Amino acid sequence: MSQYFSLLKEKFPTKSSLLTEMINLDAICHLPKGTEYFLSDLHGEYQAFDYLLRNASGSIKKKLQECFPEKDSEDIDKLCQYIYYPSEKIAAQQEILGEKALQEELSFYLPDLIQFVKYTGSKYTRSKVRKMLPADYAYIMEELLTEEQPDKNKHFYYQAILAKVIELEQLDNLFVAFAQLIQKLSIDHLHIVGDIFDRGKYPDFILERLRSFRNIDIQWGNHDITWIGAISGSYICMINVIRIAARYNSIDLIEDRYGINLRRLIEYSQSHFQEEDVFNPILDGEEIADSERMVLNQLQQATALLQFKLEHQLIKRRPCFGMEAGLLFSKIDTENQTITIGDITYPLQSFPFEMMDWDNPDGLTEEEEALLKGLMYRFQNSTLLKEHVDFLIEKGGMYHISNNHLLFHGCMPMHSNGDFKSMVFGKQAYSGRALLDFFEEQVLESYKNPDSHEDFQTDIFWYLWCGEVSSLFGKDRMTTFERYYIADKTSHVEHKNPYYKLRENEEICLRILEEFGLDKSAHIVNGHTPVKEKGGELPIKANGRMIIIDGGLAKGYQKTTGIAGYTLISNSYGLELVAHKPFSSVQDVLEGKCDIIFIKRLVEIVENRTLVKETDNGQLLLKEIADLEYLYHHFDQF
C-alpha cells in the first residue's frame, strides 16, 4: 500500500494538485448520471441501427422540444433532420435552395445547434465535452460554446468568427461538426446485448460504428460466437458462417469487404452439386440474377454437407457434450433413402447420397481437407475481420453487470423446477454464473491459440452455438439437418429451455439476480428471442425484473413481432423502453416521412435524479477520492 501511495504522489506531486483533483472528482460525482442505451439483435441491419444512434432512439427530438418550447413542429422536424443526417440534409437543401439561400438557412439554424449542445451537454464537465470535439474545429467550437451570455464586445467577436468561417466556405463543415457532437452527447454508454452478426448484410459496418464509441460493452450472441470461433480456428464455425451468408445472400460481406476468397469453394460446389429448391437463398424482397441464385444454392449445399461431416467428427470426439442425437448419418437407410429419428422414419429430400463414402460417412476427402485449410488461412489473415473480432473480444463477454442491470443474450439454462441446469466438463459440474464464467474462459483461451483446431477450447464454440446447456442457444437441439433434408415439419421442432417460461416469474428472476450478486431492485436485460408484440406479448415481465429488448430489428422477424426493435434507455430519471417502427430510408427521414418511435413505456422512475456517485463508475471515483484524501492528509509520509 505504501508503494501505491508513493506512485500516486508521483502523479500528484503537490498538495494543491491533489486538492484540485479531489474537487474535480467530487464535482463529477454530483452530476446526473449519463444516459445508457441498451440494444440487442442487430443482425447486420446497419441502416436501421445507425438511424437509432443518430436520433438516440427518439431522445434528441424529445429534448429539442424541451429546449425550444416556442418552436413549431415543422421547425423541430427540420432541426431533427439536420442533426440526424447533417451532410445528407445539407446536400438535399442545396439542390432545393441553391448555395446562397442554403448558407442563410445554416446561419439561421447554427445558433440553435449551439444552444442545443449546451442543453444536452449540461450534465457533463467541460473537459468531457472538449474531448468529444473534432480536432479541426475544436478551438472554434469551444469559443462558440464557452460564454452563456456574451457581452457586446464578445458579440462582435463571435460574429467575426462566423463571418470568417463563411468566407472560407467552412460553414457546412462546422454545422456538421455541431450536429455530430449532439449525437455523441446524447449517448453516454452503449450496451449491445448480442448478435451483431446474422442474416443482415452489414455487421461489419455496425462494428466500425461501434468502434467509434468511447463507452461500450458487448454481450456475445450465438451468431457472434461463431465468427469469433472461425477466427479462433474452428473449421465448423467457419463453414457455418459461410453457409448462413449463402442462405441470406450476404457473401459480399465475406468476399468483398473481409477480402476472403471463396473461389475454390464455389468451384467445388459447382462441380459436385446441382440446384435443389430447398437450398434457394432467402432474399427478403431482393432480386438477384438466376446465375447468382444458382451459385448461392450450390454453395449452401456444399457448406451444409461439410458442416454436417465436421459436426459428426466433433460429437464423436466430445462425448461430454452429450450431442449424440446429432449423429444422423448412422440413421440413414441408403437403399430406401430414408432416415429414422426416434420411432419415426422420414423420406429424405435433396440429400447428396452420391457425395458420401458410406464406409466413412463423416470423413473428408483430400479435396475437402485442402479447401478447409485454405479457407481457414484466409479467414485468419483477413485484417479487417481480425480487427472486428479483436474488438468483440476486448469489449465483449458472456454477460455483463452494470449499474444494477444484468445483461446476457440468450438464457440462463434451467430445469423446469427452476434449478440451474448443470454441465459436467472434466470432473467439474458448472451451472448458473459459474457456467457462463467457464464458457468465457474457454473462449478467451481458444482465441489466444488460433493454430489449434480440434482442442476442447475450440470445440466449445460449437457447443455454444447449438449445445443443450449453452446460454447462447437455449434449446434442446438444432434441427438444421432436418430443415434441409426432411419435408415433414414435425421433425423441425426445437424445444426451448424452460427458462423462457420461467422468466415470467418474479421469484425466478430474483434467484438469477441473486446468483450474480444483485439485489431485488435490479433488472435482467435479455435479447435473443423476438417479442411477439402484435400478438399481445409484453417485453416487460416478472413485475419489471425482466426486460426483453429483442423486438425484431431484422426485417425477417418484423412480421412476427409487429415492430422493429426496442431500445432500453436508462437516464438519471429512471428507465424507459422504446419500441420502434421499421426504418424505411434516409431519404424518407429527410422528407419527414419516417418517425421511427412507436411506443414508449416507462419501466421505472426514481424519486431523485440518479447522480454519478450512485453508479458503478461513481463508486470507483469515490474510492479514488478517498485515496487522494488519505494522501493529502499524510503527504509527508510518502
Swiss-Prot record:
Cofactor: Mn(2+)
Entry's family note: Belongs to the FBPase class 3 family.
Keyword Cytoplasm: no
A GO term for molecular function: fructose 1,6-bisphosphate 1-phosphatase activity
Protein name: Fructose-1,6-bisphosphatase class 3
Residue intervals passing through the bilayer: none
Biological process terms in GO annotation: gluconeogenesis
First-tier enzyme category under EC: hydrolase
Record key words, sorted: Carbohydrate metabolism, Hydrolase, Manganese
Source species: Streptococcus uberis (strain ATCC BAA-854 / 0140J)
Reactions performed catalytically: beta-D-fructose 1,6-bisphosphate + H2O = beta-D-fructose 6-phosphate + phosphate
Keyword flag Hydrolase: yes
Entry EC number(s): 3.1.3.11
Gene transcribed to yield this protein: fbp
Pathway stated in the Swiss-Prot or TrEMBL entry: Carbohydrate biosynthesis; gluconeogenesis
One Pfam family recorded for the sequence: FBPase_2
Taxonomy of the source species: Bacteria, Bacillati, Bacillota, Bacilli, Lactobacillales
